Structures are given as C-alpha cells and as structure tokens.
Amino acid sequence: GLAPCELCLKQRTVYWVAGAVAIVAMIVVRLPGGPRLREASCWLLALVFLVSVGVAGYHAGVEWKFWPGPQSCSGGGTVTVAALRDLLNGGGVKMPACDQPAWTFAGLSMAGWNTVASMILVGFSVAAALRERGRT
C-alpha cells in the first residue's frame, strides 16, 4: 500500500464525517417526523462534500506547486503508532511529503481524483436535496 501524507489523512477524515452524517440521517428519517429532514440531510451532505472538494483541491494544488503546503507536510510530520513501532524495530520510516504525489492516473494524483469525485458527490447531494424539495 501507499503511505498517506498528512493531507491525505485529512481527506479521509471528511469521508468519515460524511459516513457518520449519512448513517445518522438514515436513522433519523425513519423516526416519526423524520422524513421532513431528508432535504436538510442532503444539504448537509452536500456541505460535507464541498469541504472535501476544498481539502482535496488544496492538496492537489500543493502537489502542483500552486501554493505551499503546511509546515508539517514536509515528509517529517506526524508519525503513526505503526511507523513508530517500525522505527523502534530498526527500520527508518518517514512520512511522505504532501507535495509529492504517490500515484497518478491520466495526469491526476489521488488528491486530484478525490477533488473530481467530491465534486460529483456534491452534485448528487444537491440533486437529491432538490428532488426532496419537490416532494414536499
């Protein structure tokens, strides 16, 4: 597998939040009076995915050298427990730098593709919210 940098981990956090929002929304809309909250849930998911567009777009911009990344993203940032264990066992483990894409496809890094995917998810969420608005 590819070791994630600090900004990669921040991108994952947004998806954990989206998953939590979606699970809570699925439960709430089944409660009495809950169906009225479907539209709001869709708008909230759109907002979460819009944050994802920002985080992933920022990371892609760092990779393309459009702007500098955070100081902690220079390849020596946060160390995970697994990395610390490997280091204690004699292996030198270094967090990857945020400005070095670990993988690219069709000219886009994983951060670039995440930006595209997040934009699509914003579109789906907005479309679902507007569809719910039309039902009420």
What are these regions (language model features)?
Residues 23-33, 126-133:
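Structural signal for the C-terminal ends of transmembrane alpha-helices
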Residues 1-3, 22-25, 61-64, 89-90:
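Immediate flanking context of iron-sulfur cluster ligation sites
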Residues 64-109:
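Extracytosolic (periplasmic/ER-lumenal) interhelical loops and adjacent juxtamembrane/interface segments
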Residues 2-17:
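Loop-to-helix transition at the N-terminal end of transmembrane alpha-helices
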Residues 93-136:
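A hydrophobic membrane-anchoring alpha-helix module
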Residues 31-53, 123:
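Interfacial segments of alpha-helical transmembrane regions
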Residues 50-66, 84:
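C-terminal TM-helix exit segments that contain a strictly Trp-centered aromatic cap at the helix terminus
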Residues 12, 41-45, 114:
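Alpha-helical transmembrane segments of integral membrane proteins
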